[in-house]
Amino acid sequence: MSRFLSRLELEAMGFASLGADVKIDRQAVFINPDTVSLGDHCRIDAFSLISAGAEGVRIGRYVHLGASCQIFGGGGAVLLEDFSCLSGRATAYTSSVSLLSRIKNLMFNPTLPEAFRSISQGPVILRKHSGVGCGSVVLPGVEMGFGSAAGALTLVRKSLPEGVVICGNPPQVLLHRDRSELERLEEEFFAMEWGEPDI
C-alpha cells in the first residue's frame, strides 16, 4: 500500500476542491476538509495537521507541507500560494491569546468564554515562492510577501515584504531574493517536458 492516499480516497474526504496529482500522506489529519482547497501537485507529509475554520485553507500548486506541520485556521483564512512551503514542524496560527493585553489578569484557556481572554486573530498568507523554515511559527495577521522566507526556528510576528529573508529570534534580515530570478526559474520549470499543468 502506498504511503499516499489514492485519488478515490482523497475524493471521499470531501475537500472544497482537489487538484491533479495531489499527494497526502496517510498519517496527515484534516479537520473540516470541506473548507480546504488543494492545488495541483501539492504534497502534505506525515503527521501534519490542517485544522480549517469557516474561512478555509487554500493551498496552491506545487506547495509542500513537511512532516508535522500544523495549520490552525479557526481565526481566519489561510492562503498558501503556488510554490510556497512550510518545512517540517512549522506552524501557522490564525488565532492566539494576546499576552500584550492591557488587562493583565485575563486567562489563557480556550475552554473559557472569550470575555475571560484576550484573543488576537487574523489571516495567514504565504505569497508565491515564500517559505517557512523548520520549527518556525507564523502568528495571526502575517502576510509573507512574494519570495520572502523565514529560516529555521524563527517567530514570524510581522508581515514580511517581498523577497526579504529573515532568521533568528529576534529575527534579522539575511538577504533579499530577486523577483525576476524567481519568475525566470518558474518559467524554466514550466517549459520542461511536462509543461504547465491544466488549471
Predicted features by range, described:
Residues 1-37, 41, 193-199:
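Extended, small-residue-rich solenoid/repeat segments and analogous flexible loops
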Residues 7, 26-38, 43-142, 169-170, ...:
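Flexible, glycine/small-residue-enriched loop-and-beta-strand segment within the central core
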Residues 15, 47, 68, 181-185, ...:
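Generic hydrophobic, helix-prone segments enriched in Leu/Val/Ile
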Residues 18-22, 60-63, 145-148:
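Short, conserved structural micro-motifs that define repeat-unit consensus positions
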Residues 22, 90, 164:
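Short, conserved active-site loop motifs that form the nucleotide-linked donor/cofactor pocket
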Residues 37-38, 137-186:
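C-terminal/domain-terminus segments
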Residues 86-91, 149-158, 194-199:
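Short flexible/disordered coil segments
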Residues 187-193:
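C-terminal boundary and immediately downstream tail of ABC-type ATPase nucleotide-binding domains
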